[in-house]
């Protein structure tokens, strides 16, 4: 029997195969580190008298806690400042490359890895962060790990793991204008639920996926965890190779040729069997937004807020009632009539140059509504520099948006960019949990196109609503 893409990468990295109920011992090719989940791991090494086994396969960047304004000033919050300072000391002591605030390559860890060419097909990638699945867009087996596992990888460059199940997400057809990969993944999560992918590696396949850019693919894989999955993957192809060629850490010359020949073998075999399969028709998809407090509570933008009274399942009805109460929404309200206070464009989901270009195209010649605040936060300093070279920052500021430095920003309430209680946002990030963007904040997950149109109209909107 043939093997799936995930199985091929897994098999290639087994250091020791587990017997019986024992896990396999897997080699890790790339370990990404940031300031939040690493302090205890480094302290564990220190207490045990251990060194980092492969500092050359480890990269650190400051992203979660960093401010996106006044980056030349000391960090005001004492906890955030301590975590950033601790990362700097740990990286210096253990010989790990670090991209600190203000560095030309600093940014969100899942934006930095791919843009440097560190994320490559057929590799294993881990990070103490849920959205490590982003890197699966390259055909890498990439997943988030906990702090104790971070320490294990630092010490041994391996992880003991049991094989994951595999699920095919087949997306056939052609996306309509105005529909993006963010809409696709929100539709996938709405279809299978936030627990539908639990224990699985999701492989996104089909003609619609093949037509996507690498940045669009990263958006989809990024949110695999929101369906409960361990990872998301896409088989590498010419689009992948074109993105990687010439990047700082990509192979060169004959090594590039050899790498591409190997990468071309990283496709699911025709006779391979998935443990589960799901199919979506890309032709039928429209812009998607979330209305509730988990990424699975999403609907097409043209829909209305659901009515709990119409839901037969008691637990689902209760969850809907609870979400609507927190979100301050009334059943039956058209989503297009939901007004927002803030629009956030950024994050490891949608903070890349392609995302900024898409939003800028919508905002060009238009103004952000007077009652709306819009934050535009590039995913990395490299993205910021490129955007400024293209004049995108001028489009944003002319429209009335704020142009910031790189960081996780308003994706999570760990830095100064937060919502206030009751404040409502349209956000291109990945999670809409209660308090995710700040205590009492209300989050609607959207694509960059919907974010830009919403900023102009002041209510959840798509670009077609501006015509």
Curated annotation (Swiss-Prot):
- CC cofactor note: Binds 1 [4Fe-4S] cluster per subunit.
- Names of the cofactor(s): [4Fe-4S] cluster
> Region Disordered: start and end of each range?
417-445
Please name the PROSITE patterns in this protein's record: ACONITASE_1 (PS00450), ACONITASE_2 (PS01244)
Biological process, per Gene Ontology = L-leucine biosynthetic process
**Family under the similarity heading:** Belongs to the aconitase/IPM isomerase family. LeuC type 1 subfamily.
**Functional description taken from the UniProt entry:** Catalyzes the isomerization between 2-isopropylmalate and 3-isopropylmalate, via the formation of 2-isopropylmaleate.
How is the subunit organization of this protein annotated in UniProt? Answer: Heterodimer of LeuC and LeuD.
> What's the name of the protein?
3-isopropylmalate dehydratase large subunit
List the source organism. Answer: Saccharopolyspora erythraea (strain ATCC 11635 / DSM 40517 / JCM 4748 / NBRC 13426 / NCIMB 8594 / NRRL 2338)
């Amino acid at each position: 029997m043939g093997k799936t893409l995930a199985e091929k990468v897994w098999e290639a990295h087994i250091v020791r195969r587990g017997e019986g109920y024992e896990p396999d011992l897997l080699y890790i090719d790339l370990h990404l580190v940031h300031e939040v989940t690493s302090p205890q791991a480094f302290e564990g090494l220190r207490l045990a008298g251990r060194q980092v086994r492969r500092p050359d396969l480890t990269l650190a960047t400051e992203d979660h806690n960093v401010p996106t304004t006044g980056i030349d000033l000391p960090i005001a919050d004492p906890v955030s400042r301590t975590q950033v300072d601790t990362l700097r000391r740990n990286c210096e002591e253990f010989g790990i490359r670090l991209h600190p605030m203000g560095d030309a390559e600093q940014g969100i860890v899942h934006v930095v890895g791919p843009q440097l060419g560190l994320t490559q097909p057929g590799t294993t990638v881990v990070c103490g962060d849920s959205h490590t699945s982003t890197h699966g867009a390259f055909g890498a087996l990439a997943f988030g790990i906990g702090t104790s596992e971070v320490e294990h990888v630092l010490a041994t460059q391996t992880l003991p793991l049991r094989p994951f199940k595999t699920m095919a997400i087949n997306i056939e057809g052609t996306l309509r204008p105005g529909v993006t990969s963010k809409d696709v993944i929100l539709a996938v999560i709405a279809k299978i639920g936030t627990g539908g992918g639990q224990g699985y590696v999701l492989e996104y396949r089909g003609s619609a996926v093949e037509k996507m850019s690498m940045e669009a693919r990263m958006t989809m894989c990024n949110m695999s965890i929101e369906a409960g999955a361990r990872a998301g993957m896409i088989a590498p192809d010419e689009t992948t190779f074109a993105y990687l060629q010439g990047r700082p850490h990509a192979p060169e010359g004959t090594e590039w040729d050899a790498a591409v020949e190997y990468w071309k073998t990283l496709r699911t075999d025709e006779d391979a069997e998935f443990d589960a399969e799901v199919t979506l028709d890309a032709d039928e998809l429209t812009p998607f937004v979330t209305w509730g407090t988990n990424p699975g509570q999403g609907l097409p933008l043209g829909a209305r807020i659901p009515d709990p009274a119409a839901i037969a399942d008691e637990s689902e009805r209760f969850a809907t009632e609870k979400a609507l109460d927190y979100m301050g929404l009334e059943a039956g309200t058209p989503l297009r009539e939901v007004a927002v206070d803030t629009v956030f464009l950024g994050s490891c989901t949608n903070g890349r140059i392609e995302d900024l270009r898409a939003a800028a195209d919508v905002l060009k010649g238009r103004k952000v509504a007077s009652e709306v605040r819009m934050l535009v936060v590039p995913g990395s300093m490299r993205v910021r520099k490129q955007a400024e070279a293209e004049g995108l920052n001028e489009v944003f500021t002319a429209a009335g948006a704020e142009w910031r430095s790189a960081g996780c920003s308003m994706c999570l309430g760990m830095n100064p960019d937060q919502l206030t209680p009751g404040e409502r946002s349209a956000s291109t990030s990945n999670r809409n949990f209660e308090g995710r963007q700040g205590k009492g904040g209300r989050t609607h997950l959207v694509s960059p196109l919907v974010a830009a149109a919403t900023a102009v109209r002041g209510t959840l909107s798509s670009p077609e609503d501006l015509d």
